[in-house]
């Protein structure tokens, strides 16, 4: 299974954008019924999502960010959409305990957007109905009055650990709100990648190629991974238990496995380099 790299939000009350989002190159399209839709249009947005899911085409996965399950709207969203074959997963906002995940009719990504959600991250991630977790950083930073990026990194790492311990895919980054600042987006993605985050949600199609490039292995990384994999294959042919690199260093099985993942990701995201 390929882990998504790019996730594109599209407002649920803008159905004319659904097909464009699916054709944007994003791995996952997220129809948003929550923050992007004013209360007066939420019923309309839900109906739009249902109509699209009934006829959807294309290779991108389609998720729906529903309204808070603590509200009647969230439960209505689940009732209307949960049984539709075109829905791959729902994104649940403001998850603060594992109990709210019981009995869901569809796979769920839990969004951790509060102090309570971070504290409960491990139990939420371990819930059998959860297939991924992500951070809602703007709400979280506002609640905690955080302006220091290093403090946010501490919270991000807690969620990275919770996902890994539960055997979930890597945690994607939250949206970068400045659509015009592509250099800032790329730098932010690289910083997130360095602490174990992988992939990112976007709010505009123009952000998709920037995110994709930022999470693609560099030439230096692919060269190093190739060297490790080749050394591992030579050791296996020779019946050697240890893998020695040309520079004399030894690497163990987890390093070899990571090198194989790096090469697989590079071939997926930049196949022209492997032709």
Tell me what each language-model feature is:
Residues 1-275:
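Expand to "…catalyze enediolate/carbanion chemistry for C-C bond making/breaking, isomerization
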């Amino acid at each position: 299974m390929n882990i998504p790299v790019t996730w594109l939000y599209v407002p649920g009350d803008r159905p004319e954008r659904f097909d464009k989002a699916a054709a944007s190159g994003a791995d996952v399209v997220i129809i948003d019924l929550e923050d992007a839709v004013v209360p007066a249009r939420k019923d309309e947005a839900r109906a739009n999502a249902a109509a699209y899911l009934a006829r959807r085409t294309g290779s991108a996965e389609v998720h729906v960010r529903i309204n808070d399950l603590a509200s009647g709207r969230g439960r209505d969203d689940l009732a209307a959409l949960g049984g539709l074959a075109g829905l791959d997963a729902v994104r649940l906002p403001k998850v603060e305990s594992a109990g709210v995940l019981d009995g869901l009719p569809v796979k769920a990504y839990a969004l951790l957007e509060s102090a309570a959600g971070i504290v409960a991250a491990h139990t939420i991630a371990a819930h059998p109905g959860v297939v991924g977790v992500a951070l809602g950083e703007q709400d979280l930073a506002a609640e905690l009055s955080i302006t220091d990026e290093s403090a946010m990194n501490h919270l991000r790492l807690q969620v990275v650990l919770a996902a890994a311990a539960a055997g979930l895919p890597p945690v994607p980054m939250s949206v970068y709100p400045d659509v015009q600042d592509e250099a800032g987006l790329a730098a932010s993605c690289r910083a997130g990648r360095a602490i174990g985050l992988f992939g990112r949600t976007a709010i505009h199609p123009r952000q998709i190629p920037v995110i994709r490039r930022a999470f693609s292995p560099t030439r230096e990384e692919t060269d190093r991974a190739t060297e490790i994999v080749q050394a591992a294959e030579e050791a296996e042919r020779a019946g050697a238990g240890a893998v020695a690199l040309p520079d004399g260093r030894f690497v163990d099985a987890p390093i070899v496995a990571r090198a194989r993942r790096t090469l697989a990701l590079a071939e997926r995201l930049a196949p022209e380099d492997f032709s």
